[in-house]
Amino acid sequence: MKTKTSIKQICNLCKIVRRNKRLVNTCKLHKNHKHKQK
C-alpha cells in the first residue's frame, strides 16, 4: 500500500496513522516536534 508521501520523507521509525481522514505520522523521536508543529 503506497500512500502519497508528501509529509517529508517518513522515516522507518515513523508510523503512519490514519485518523479522521487525516494522515498523522507518529514518530518516537518526532513526537515532540509534531506537537510543536501546527
Curated annotation (Swiss-Prot):
Disulfide bonds: none
Keyword match Transport: no
One of the GO biological process terms: translation
UniProt entry tagged with the keyword Hydrolase: no
Molecular-function GO terms, alphabetical: structural constituent of ribosome
Record key words, sorted: Apicoplast, Plastid, Ribonucleoprotein, Ribosomal protein
Cell location: Plastid, Apicoplast
Any one annotated GO CC term: ribonucleoprotein complex
Domain of life: Eukaryota
Principal cellular location given in the protein's record: plastid
NCBIfam families, sorted: rpmJ_bact
Family: Belongs to the bacterial ribosomal protein bL36 family.
Record's protein name: Large ribosomal subunit protein bL36c
Organism this protein belongs to: Theileria parva (East coast fever infection agent)
Lineage, broadest ranks: Eukaryota, Sar, Alveolata, Apicomplexa, Aconoidasida
Gene: rpl36
